[in-house]
Swiss-Prot record:
GO terms for molecular function: tRNA (guanine(37)-N1)-methyltransferase activity. This is tRNA (guanine-N(1)-)-methyltransferase. HAMAP family: TrmD. Belongs to the RNA methyltransferase TrmD family. It comes from Mycoplasma genitalium (strain ATCC 33530 / DSM 19775 / NCTC 10195 / G37). It is found in: Cytoplasm. GO terms for cellular component: cytosol. Pfam families: tRNA_m1G_MT (PF01746). Keywords: Cytoplasm, Methyltransferase, S-adenosyl-L-methionine, Transferase, tRNA processing. The lineage of its organism: Bacteria, Bacillati, Mycoplasmatota, Mycoplasmoidales, Mycoplasmoidaceae. Its main location: cytoplasm. It catalyses: guanosine(37) in tRNA + S-adenosyl-L-methionine = N(1)-methylguanosine(37) in tRNA + S-adenosyl-L-homocysteine + H(+). S-adenosyl-L-methionine binds at G110, L129, G130, D131, F132, V133, L134. One of its GO terms (biological process) is tRNA N1-guanine methylation.
């Protein structure tokens, strides 16, 4: 997979991509990253990326021309262009899985008041992290990249993916490490039993309880899917 990030702040992106799992994925040739500053595609000598909004209003609007020029240069027939904006669908684990199917992702990261509306005809999908506003789209881009890349086969252990949160709409089970007794708060005995069937059953039960307590929205989806399977 190739991922191209279009941004005005490329120095924000590279440190994360060149560390930890993202770096390992690059070294294993499982993903290729490209970070592009679309300011370089401005036609004027001042490299102007924003301007005042027609009709008035606060904030500056990102100009369409440099972004369109940049997209036309980097977009290929196999590209999928994702705009990172709070007006998009909320990003999820399922969304990340779908993104792994594309050979080339182009992530467009914004700033300021927003984009000139005329760029939207060049966009395939709009993604948001949630109903809140960030100063820019770089954090969103990195979140989308991390969640997507780690799902690419070979990046991390397959078993780790199966056990992670949001698999089957359940949060991950509680985990423990040494010491066994922390001021009277002890590790559940079943985890020390060596009985893998009992441990698996205990963990599944804890997943359900944890999801019901902390994410009732996910728990509702879990029950709906369970009932659907039992029909």
């Amino acid at each position: 997979m190739k991922i191209t990030v279009l941004t005005l702040f490329e120095n924000t992106i590279w440190p994360y991509l060149n560390s930890s799992i993202m770096l390992q994925a690059q070294k294993a040739n499982l993903v290729q990253f490209e970070v592009v500053n679309w300011r370089n595609f401005c036609n004027d000598k001042h490299k102007t990326v924003d301007d005042m909004a027609y009709g008035g209003g606060s904030g500056m609007v990102l100009k369409a021309e440099p972004i369109i020029n940049c997209l036309n240069f980097y977009k290929a027939p196999n590209s999928h262009v994702v705009l990172l904006s709070p007006e998009g669908e909320q990003f999820s684990q399922n969304c990340a899985k779908k993104l792994t199917k594309y050979e080339h992702l182009i992530l467009l990261s914004g700033h300021y008041e927003g984009f000139d509306q005329r760029i939207y005809k060049y966009i395939d999908q709009i993604v948001s992290l949630g109903d809140f506003v960030l100063s820019g789209g770089e954090l969103v881009a990195l979140s989308v990249i991390d969640a997507t890349v780690r799902l690419i086969k070979g990046v991390i252990n397959d078993q780790s993916l199966i056990c992670e949160s949001f698999n089957d709409n359940l949060l991950d089970f509680p985990v423990y490490t040494r010491p066994y007794d922390l001021k009277g708060d002890k590790v559940p005995e079943v985890l020390l039993s060596g009985d893998h069937q009992k441990i698996e059953s205990f963990r599944k039960e804890q997943q359900i309880l944890k999801t019901a307590k902390y994410r009732p929205d996910l728990y509702k989806k879990y029950l709906e899917n369970k009932n659907e399977k039992n029909k």
